[in-house]
Amino acid sequence: ECMKFLSKNIRYPKTAWKNKVQGRVIVQFWVETDGSISDVKVVKGVSWDLNDEAIRVVKSMPNFKPGTVGGEPARIQFNLPIIFRLQ
């Protein structure tokens, strides 16, 4: 579901396309106890434009099902790789 959302919503930045920039951006974020996403940041970037697009698309994702610890909702950290590849 997450990958389907990303593939439909990522827009390859024009400057990156023009300069033939591609690579993998790793975005770190937290899923809160209510399923919302917070504290989105790039932990491994490629270029400012690909990094910005990765952050934008992660922030636009719908709420997740919250994680649980011992049956209780818990705040969970994720690292999500987003691959930008020119076709």
What kind of feature is each model-predicted range?
Residues 13, 32, 43:
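Residue-level recognition of the GNAT/N-acetyltransferase active site
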Residues 43-50:
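A short acidic/small-residue loop/turn micro-motif
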Residues 30, 45, 79:
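Short loop/turn motifs enriched for small/polar and acidic residues
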Residues 1-27, 53-87:
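Short proline/glycine- and basic residue-enriched helix-capping loop/turn segments at helix->loop/beta transitions
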Residues 34, 45, 83-87:
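Short coil/turn motifs at secondary-structure junctions
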Residues 31-32, 37, 68:
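Short, acidic, Ser/Thr-enriched surface-loop or helix-capping motifs
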